[in-house]
A protein has these predicted regions:
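Short, function-defining helix-loop hinge/capping sites that tune catalysis or transport
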Residues: 14, 83-90, 157, 224
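Divalent metal-coordination and catalytic microenvironments
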Residues: 7, 37, 42, 69, ...
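Histidine-rich, glycine-flanked metal-binding segment
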Residues: 13-72
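Metal-associated gating/positioning segment near the N- to mid-region
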Residues: 62-129
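Extreme N-terminal starter segment of soluble prokaryotic enzymes
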Residues: 1-4
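Metal-coordinating catalytic core of metallo-dependent amide/deamination hydrolases
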Residues: 115-130, 136, 144-230
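Conserved beta1/A-loop at the N-terminus of ABC ATPase nucleotide-binding domains
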Residues: 8-12
Length: 230
């Protein structure tokens, strides 16, 4: 059990759940000044103003946190990340500055193809080590749940390697992690002249092996057949 008291500002509080918030309502965030928050069994047990706090009746296994001059708010949920990757593509930033389009960079072997090449040579241990550093960084910045995509493998074996890494990361961090199989992130070089065969490979081989939690197709102009992604 945890009691957080003397909270300067408790952010995003609602007496009753809301299905969604849209339009002008998004400008308003419900807050309580000088608040308390009780947590029991990892769930919020109660909250309110310190002026209305009834005090503590059961001190058993209770941890008290004084949050004077501090703000308490929900953690962030990052629903789109590529935390697992090998190396960077900073050289392509110069290409973009010089006016090259993503498609032009891709045709030269850059973009996702560049990342796939780097990932091919990286070990699972190397990928885990670098990804853990990134996860720790976003956790310190307030993220509590994160989605991680594959998609830099572009082959069944490499995509499986990425998904194994993501699975292992779940056990190495307190963050909630959801995995997404993004095998159709780009078309590998060997399938550039027969793109439909790559889509068939994803559907017939990869999906049959139930890779990841979800199959998603990314539509990029000139990189995919639109009709093949529906």
């Amino acid at each position: 059990k945890i009691l957080i008291k003397n909270i300067k500002e408790l952010v995003q509080v609602e007496e009753t759940p809301k299905l969604k918030v849209s339009g002008a309502d998004m400008k308003t965030i419900s807050c309580i000044q000088n608040a308390w928050l009780a947590i029991e069994d990892d769930k919020i047990a109660g909250f309110g103003k310190m002026d209305d706090w009834e005090g503590i009746s059961d001190w058993t296994n209770l941890t008290i946190i004084d949050a004077s001059d501090k703000i308490v708010m929900p953690c962030y949920c990052d629903s789109h990340t590529h935390i697992v990757y090998a190396g960077s593509r900073e050289g392509e930033f110069v290409d973009r500055i010089n006016g090259l389009t993503y498609e032009q960079i891709f045709e030269r072997g850059g973009g996702i193809l560049n990342s796939a090449k780097k990932l091919h040579y990286a070990t699972e241990e190397e990928l885990i080590e670098s990804a853990l550093k990134r996860l720790n960084e976003i956790m310190l910045q307030g993220t509590g749940a994160v989605e991680i995509k594959s998609g830099y493998g572009l082959s069944t074996d490499a995509e499986l390697k990425m998904l194994r890494v993501i699975k292992k990361l779940k056990a190495l961090t307190p963050l909630t992690i959801k995995a997404t199989f993004l095998g159709a992130h780009a078309i590998p070089k060997e399938y550039q002249e027969s793109r439909s065969k790559y889509i068939d490979l994803l559907i017939n081989e990869d999906c049959r092996r139930k890779i990841g939690r979800l199959l998603r197709c990314v539509l990029r102009t000139k990189l995919f057949y639109k009709r093949r992604n529906r």
